Design a protein with these regions (language model features):
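Serine/threonine-rich low-complexity intrinsically disordered regions
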Residues: 1, 240, 253-254, 260, ...
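Gram-negative bacterial Sec-dependent N-terminal signal peptides
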Residues: 2-22
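Short boundary motifs at domain starts and secondary-structure transition points
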Residues: 19-21, 173-176, 505-508
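Acidic, metal/ion-coordinating pockets
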Residues: 23-334, 382-393, 406, 462, ...
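Catalytic centers of hydrolytic enzymes
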Residues: 25-28, 37-46, 50-65, 95, ...
């Protein structure tokens, strides 16, 4: 096989041993990704009720029963951006559930770093949160105290401690089946620093995915392991259709598609047999050419335990290499034939009971269903605009920042407040599911020229941007763009409260100052937009530490929320 020679530091591994078998050996790999602490069902797929981790566990057990030689793996974002029932307890419930589901390996994803490096290490090794009394609730729910930590292995091949050069977690893990082993290399996307808070990962370095994988191949093969599987928290976007979760577009590697994983796979050593991915909002089951043009399987389940990938691999008895692979994405459908795993049901309901008083607290009244679905033309959503409006309202007063507009990242909107809540009260739990991060708000001063430049960088080809990523904007601020114009020159109109800032692509007053509110993720160079770096010297930001739900509350009782009217952005006619 083709080998790519790269220097590699000695990296630790995890090893699991299973009973000895003979002849060609079939092994079942049970894979999922982007669980995000969804202990209960996150909704439907094509109008079919799916998920709930106790139902998911029943599917895993059913697949396990088909073959005693099995392994369960996750391709990242197991925790982070979680509903209240998990995140209120710092995702300890999710780790405890996965221990009981008998997960073997989890490759870190970007959301594993949401609460910083030390908290992620606590997820692996256990112990109570140093500050929050909501941690270590085992006595009330029937789990060990202090928090037991993960009994499965986190993997982080491309995440290094900058001081020591060691990986944060083992680069790969192995599981033995008779005389042979399968190696699982686990890693997150190299771009993780651009989508998590920098403060929590300042001691870490994130390396190129393909280079990291290829550098490990000689070490793994020197151990006599030929079967190599990659668990990577990186994928891609493709046009989605309702209920499509087990297919792949013929032109999956087309330059017209945003498919970062295709670029990574195209560089992989031919020793890699299978790539299990995460990070994308859709499921796929593909075969993508590697560095020598051989098509290798690349899979992605749908998040929130709604789809599980059932993979059968055949190990050659002589070489130990994978000689055959079959794959199938299975919908985790709720129906009468599926009996949820009782112990897991009991555990998640115990945590739900603890969270219920807070989750049920009414903080507002629905005046319309609010969704996070982005308009394909202007990139805006009802939910994103409403959050931006709330952030502007919280920081408009001179005492709280003097903001004139607010910008919100669409990736920070994690759930809908759908028709099932309308008409009716909005609860803390519903708001928390929509905005689970607990970010702070920061208001800073920019010139009109700086703001225009930030907006230009939302579009592909401007200063290395690979895909369109549009910020959600507050009411009163609008702009128009022409995507056919040259890179970094696409903003043709920009206005604030009826006052023109840009007309015909030209700034009217480049030095005009504006007070802009964003969350601290965006301010901390999130999305690779230089909002913090460009804040004017001598104009410090005003920080307000609050969850979005607090912005919507008042002492008089439930607040009527008016949903912004779309569009606030549009392509020019």
């Amino acid at each position: 096989m083709f080998k790519r020679r790269l220097c590699a530091a000695l990296l630790s591994t995890l090893a699991i041993v299973t009973p000895v078998v003979s002849a060609d050996t079939q092994v079942k790999i049970i894979a999922f990704n982007d669980f995000h602490g969804n202990l209960f069902s996150a909704g439907n797929v094509a109008d079919v009720p799916v998920g709930g981790v106790d139902v998911f566990a029943a599917y895993v057990d059913k697949l396990r029963a088909q073959n005693p030689y099995n392994v369960v793996v996750s391709a990242g974002d197991l925790i982070g951006a979680s509903p209240l029932v998990s995140s209120l307890f710092h995702d300890e419930p999710t780790i405890e559930v996965m221990n009981r589901l008998r997960l073997d390996f989890n490759a870190v994803g970007n959301h594993e770093f949401d609460e910083g490096t030390e908290e992620l290490l606590r997820m692996q090794h256990g112990g109570c949160h140093p500050e929050d009394v909501n941690s270590c609730q085992g006595e009330k729910v029937g789990t060990p105290v202090p928090f037991e930590g993960a009994q499965f292995g986190f993997l982080a091949a491309n995440v290094l401690n900058q001081q020591t050069g060691d990986t944060l977690f083992p680069a790969y893990g192995t599981k033995a089946f008779g005389d042979h082993e399968i190696a699982f290399i686990g890693l997150t996307l190299e771009g993780t620093p651009s989508i998590v808070l920098a403060e929590g990962i300042r001691t870490l370095q994130f390396l190129d995915e393909a280079d990291t994988i290829n550098a490990l191949i000689p070490e793994i093969r020197a151990r006599g392991v030929e079967a190599i599987v990659v668990l990577i928290h990186e994928g891609g976007l493709r046009p989605s259709a309702a209920g499509v979760y087990n297919s792949c577009l013929d032109d999956i590697t087309s330059s017209d598609l945003v498919m970062p994983i295709a670029e990574i796979v195209s560089q992989l050593d031919d020793a890699v047999d299978l790539v299990i991915t995460g990070h994308s909002p859709v499921a796929y089951n593909c075969r993508i050419p590697n560095s020598v043009g051989r098509l290798i399987p690349v899979t992605h389940a749908q998040g929130a335990a709604s789809v599980v990938t059932d993979i059968d691999v055949l190990l050659d008895d002589v070489s130990g290499d994978i000689v055959d692979i079959t794959l199938n994405n299975v919908l985790v459908e709720q129906n009468e034939s599926v009996i949820p795993v009782e112990g897991i049901t009991r555990l998640i309901h115990a945590y739900s009971d603890l969270a219920q008083p807070l989750a049920d607290r009414v903080i507002g009244v629905m005046t319309a269903a609010v969704t996070r679905s982005n308009d394909p033309t202007n990139g805006q959503s009802d939910a994103g605009n409403m959050i931006a409006d709330a952030q502007l309202a919280a920081t408009r007063s001179p005492d709280t920042g003097g903001a004139q507009l607010a910008l919100m990242n669409s990736g920070g909107v994690r759930a809908n407040m759908g028709a099932e809540l309308y008409p009716g009260h909005i609860t803390y739990g519903a708001i928390y599911s929509m905005q689970p991060f607990g970010n702070s708000l920061v208001t800073m001063t920019y010139t009109a020229a700086q703001l225009k430049e930030v907006l230009e960088q939302q579009f592909p080809e401007c200063l290395g941007r690979r895909q369109r990523t549009l910020l959600q904007v507050s009411a009163g601020f609008s702009y128009q763009f022409d995507e056919s114009a040259p890179a970094c020159n696409r903003i043709i109109e920009m206005s604030l409260n009826g006052t023109r800032l840009v007309e015909g692509g030209q700034l009217i007053d480049p030095e005009k100052t504006l007070r802009v509110t964003v969350n601290n993720f965006i301010a901390d160079v999130g999305m690779d937009l230089p909002l913090w770096a460009w804040a004017q010297i001598g104009s410090p930001g005003y920080w307000i530490s609050t969850r979005w739900s607090n912005i919507l509350c008042n002492t008089a009782g439930p607040t009527m929320l008016t949903i912004p009217t779309l569009p606030v952005l549009a392509n020019p006619v």
